[in-house]
Amino acid sequence: MGIVRFGVSIPKELLEKFDGIIEEMGYTNRSEAIRDLIRDMVVRHEWQLGDEEVAGTITIVYNHDEADVVRELLDLQHEYLNEIVSSLHVHMDEHNCLEVIVVKGRAKKIKKIADRLLSLKGVKHGKLVMTTTGRDIV
């Protein structure tokens, strides 16, 4: 992998804000921060295309006392065995549980799984976090 140097023209104030942020985040130079921004854009583009193989997590908080939420949650996980890689279950208190579901597959299908999980009655909050499989990222 070769490195290419290029120039960017931006307002001074924007650069100063950027420098402050990357210093706060622990970057040692602008180049690595810019590379990470570009990588993030590539990953988001993969998800938008829908046909790319992607990875991610679906995190939900739900009330396990709610009628059928546990059964429906398990049924959905079994329905998508090829896409659901793993799950972590945490008891938050006597009523609420946190579930982190690791997924890998085509972006459109992963979004569909997340939508179905997040819309279950009894789910209080949820979020799909999208990332890459790492295969095509440099």
From Swiss-Prot:
One Pfam family hit: NikR_C
Protein name, entry field: Putative nickel-responsive regulator
Cofactor note: Binds 1 nickel ion per subunit.
PANTHER family found in the cross-reference section: NICKEL-RESPONSIVE REGULATOR
Cofactor: Ni(2+)
Residues where Ni(2+) binds: 78, 89, 91, 97
An example Gene Ontology molecular-function term: nickel cation binding
InterPro entries per the UniProt record, alphabetical: Acetolactate_synth/TF_NikR_C, ACT-like_dom_sf, Arc_rbn_hlx_hlx, CopG, CopG/NikR_regulator, Ni_resp_reg_NikR, Ribbon_hlx_hlx, TF_NikR_Ni-bd_C
Record key words, sorted: DNA-binding, Metal-binding, Nickel, Transcription, Transcription regulation
Record function comment: Transcriptional regulator.
